[in-house]
Amino acid sequence: MKKGLGKIRKIKKKHIFLALLAVIVLGGLAKAYSAWVGTTRIAFLNYQAIALGQISHANDNAMIKLSEITTDDFDHLDDYDMIIVNGMGLRIDENQRKQLEEASYKVPTLTHAATNPANNIVSVDNFDADYLMQYIENGGKKNYHSMLAYIRKFIDGKKFMAPEPERVNERPDYLLTHFDPKDEKGDELGFNSIREYNAFLAKNGLYKDGAPTILLTGFMGAAPDMEKAFEKKGFMVYRINQLQGFIAGHHADSIQANAVVNMAHGRLGDYFVEFLKQKNIPLFSPLNINRLTTDWENDKQGMNGGFMSQSIVTPEIDGAIRPYVVFGQRINKEGLQEVYGIPDRMESFVESVQGYV
């Protein structure tokens, strides 16, 4: 009987040992998975939907998860593997700043373009900060794609699905740009002369002798959506990236423009008013509601405050007409807000411009 009980005890001890060993092994595997394989979670604070949408479009790695956060999420900052802050115009109080600083001790944090020195919270080392800043400042799909890869591989330390990031693609500040017809989700193509741009249009079947011509400028919208809408209606579109240089350098004099479309936020300035007078052409001002389209549609007031002033009132000083809503925001597949041209309103706007020219 005693021998039987002893045998049972040995078996129980063996089972307990094996169970403990399994727990240790599983725990080790879980830690290894989290350290080398798991998802890299990157939080973006105070980012405009236009910029965040571009970063989202550059992300093709299923193991990288992007999230837009606000001050309401500050109690959960430890949930992320990296925090990137747009410091321009960031409004946080002392308590919120303290929360962000404390989180930065545990979570690698990078703030760029801080207008308030107190908000310049950075906890990555100088080398990483400088490299990430270069990706951000140069922008574009390639740079954003490499930035995300850099964060996963070198900041988060993951081994699985962690490709080597490419070097920073230093993008010149082109005079004109256009989306790539062969890769609409890729980086915009850049041009520094009308001759280059016209050759590109001709090569892609977009150059049309005698067609009405639009100068498209500004950054408060999805420019490719508007380019495509006008080109579909038979317009020639010159997407101006450096408007002042374009006019001062007399590049505009070689184009028989019929109208200017400015995706405005604020004034262009007196030099541009003189340009409109000389050319005797109209200036149109499509609006970006800067919020979810569904929220805007359900709001009887629609637009108010300083954003309305910068979008409607100050552009009218330049002579802008037809302040018509064309751009809104929607939720993309990553759960982030992105700017897009609202199809029916875009079509109505283009037809309205067509009626003037």
Segments and roles (model prediction):
Residues 2-357:
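An N-terminal assembly and electron-transfer interface module characteristic of large anaerobic redox
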